[in-house]
Amino acid sequence: MTDFHRIKRLPPYVFEQVNRIKAAARARGADIIDLGMGNPDLDAPRHVIEKLVETAGKPRTDRYSASKGIAGLRRAQAGYYQRRFGVSLNPDT
């Protein structure tokens, strides 16, 4: 197997370190709500799951939103493109 020398220079995976810290805290009896990596360790409430199932079965719920987004954010993005790339964008289209 090839030894990739660049891999050895990478820092340790942060969530590996966090997992060790959490495990040690739990071993000491700490009550931890794990929100690491966006993966809660509690199940979703039953009523939330039921509403998701109900909504997923409705026609046209599998489309993107028609929302144009936040007007201030669109203006900021257009301004960034103008400053950075010299490109003029209309934030309303």
Swiss-Prot record:
Annotated signal peptide: none
Statement: the UniProt record of this protein carries the keyword Cytoplasm:
yes
Recorded catalytic reaction(s): these are: L-aspartate + 2-oxoglutarate = oxaloacetate + L-glutamate
The record's GO CC annotations read: cytoplasm
Q: Which cofactor does it need?
A: pyridoxal 5'-phosphate
Q: Which GO molecular function annotation, any one, does this entry have?
A: L-aspartate:2-oxoglutarate aminotransferase activity
Chief location of this protein? cytoplasm
Enzyme Commission number(s) from the entry: 2.6.1.1
Superkingdom of the organism of origin: Bacteria
UniProt subcellular location = Cytoplasm
User: Top-level EC class, please?
Assistant: transferase
Task: Identify the keywords attached in UniProt to this record, alphabetized.
Answer: Aminotransferase, Cytoplasm, Pyridoxal phosphate, Transferase
Give the residue spans that cross the bilayer. none
Q: Which InterPro entries match?
A: LL-DAP_aminotransferase (IPR050881), PyrdxlP-dep_Trfase (IPR015424), PyrdxlP-dep_Trfase_major (IPR015421), PyrdxlP-dep_Trfase_small (IPR015422)
PANTHER family reported in the protein's UniProt record: AMINO ACID AMINOTRANSFERASE, GLUTAMATE-PYRUVATE AMINOTRANSFERASE ALAC
Subunit relationships: Homodimer.
Q: Which family does it belong to?
A: Belongs to the class-I pyridoxal-phosphate-dependent aminotransferase family.
Q: What is this protein called?
A: Putative aspartate aminotransferase
Source organism per entry reads Methylorubrum extorquens
